[in-house]
Amino acid sequence: RGIKLIEFNADTPTSLFEAAILQWALLKQNNFNEQEQFNSIYESLMDNFKRLITLEESVEGFDEYYKGWKILFSSLANDEDALTTRLLEHIAREAGFETAFAYIDEVEFSVDGVFKDGVNYEYLFKLIPWESIAIEEGELAVLLTQVMKNQKAIILNPAYTLLFQSKGILKVLWELYPNHPLLLETSDKPLQGKKCVKKPLFGREGANVAIIESNGQVSF
């Protein structure tokens, strides 16, 4: 049926390692030419990091314009999130940035910016959902807002990514562009007479997903 938008992990790209690295490794393991990988996520991310500096489509001016601005990559202290975050750090470093990694409890936040071991970082990427920060760490949410307002640091996955991360964006898109070939019919209620999938607004990695049959019965 063609490509469909199922969700947009704008805030927490937790399938990045599988999509960018493991898929390529499987192709290589099975003697497929690596050029046949279906995506160029790794290379595209590298170029997008460079565009933070060039501020245009072309990345040829990166070396000329880059003045040593640093990116701090941070996650919770679990292996899966750390692996994904360190992959992003690796790509940014390969792009030409000065980078560092720290677990979130090692990062120093103040109205003056984002620090690790006393070093100020101009950019921050945090693999921690904004909704978790808002609910569980309200003071940090306020502080990060002050940091951005004071232009002391740029958060690479800013708070507005929460809107795109929500499954609710799929309903909005369907209402704006009904029957678009890249969209699936989406509603905040079960689709009458149709088999459908129920997802929470902020579900993670398939958690709390249910399959509803056309007769309304939940089969999974």
For the regions a protein language model found, what residue spans apply to each?
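Conserved metal-phosphate-binding beta-hairpin within the catalytic cores
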Residues: 1-12
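Domain-scale recognition of functional cores that engage charged ligands
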Residues: 15-18, 23-220
